[in-house]
Amino acid sequence: MIKSKLVSLDEAVADIADGSKVGMGGWIFNAQPMALVRALIRKGARNLDLIPTPGSIAPDMLIGAGCARSTVCVFISFEQFGLAPHFRKQAEAGTLKVYDLDGPAIAGGLRAAICDLPYMPIPDLGTDLPRHAPEFYLPLPSKPGERKMLAAAAVKPDVCLLHAQQADEYGNVQYLGSPFFDAMLAQASRKVIVSVDRIVSTETIRRNNHLTKIPSAMVDMVVEAPWGAHPSASPSLYRGDEKHLKEYVKASVSDEAFSAYLKKYARDAATQPAYLDALGGARLGTLTTSESNLT
């Protein structure tokens, strides 16, 4: 009999050791694994090496909460709200080690990990990034007139945190929007933890098998966390919460205000229902979108 992989948020992050390399799925303000991030903060995680592809509030919150020591990323952005406040603050202060890579290096590094190779060839874009992050770039020889190439070092997370719209209890994960880099990140990682807005029946998964982007064999744990990407969007289910993102940015101005923010929305909100209560149901109702896929 197939074993259920359904666990609680706290159970999902319990074995993530300090010093782990943590991949983070989604794309900026879409499908950020926020419920899992808040669980990591409650756990008191430390010295994590974050690998967002690319991220926004999820890695920034971990950085601000003192959970991270480094990032390997293309960028961490708050787009229309400015630069990611804690990422910027700690990068400028030198308390966060930042490995700044280009897109081909991240993608090539994940592909190398998937293939169990130390490197993967990528085009040389002519930037100075290889000089600043030599651990991740190896020059390759080329003849006159040939395209210059580099070898991107493997990027292999110890664990990756993803958020999708639905899955069954066995970990067959379905996306009602773009999966972004999530499937590649899952293949490259040693352990895969996925939060979903809802658990559905295996029959629903079979009936809509074209939506399955990450099969059960690749997933170690799945967590049912309604609104688990909030305040980022979960495509086809709810929009990003700009009001809350502004609240986060405002709270990030001072250590005292940010500590109060974390207390309210992460440390005191020990479960996902408690987090939703802190937000208010009326607020969430304004963010719901219409679905276009079967469930």
Give residue spans per PLM region:
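Conserved alpha/beta enzyme-core scaffold
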Residues: 1-295
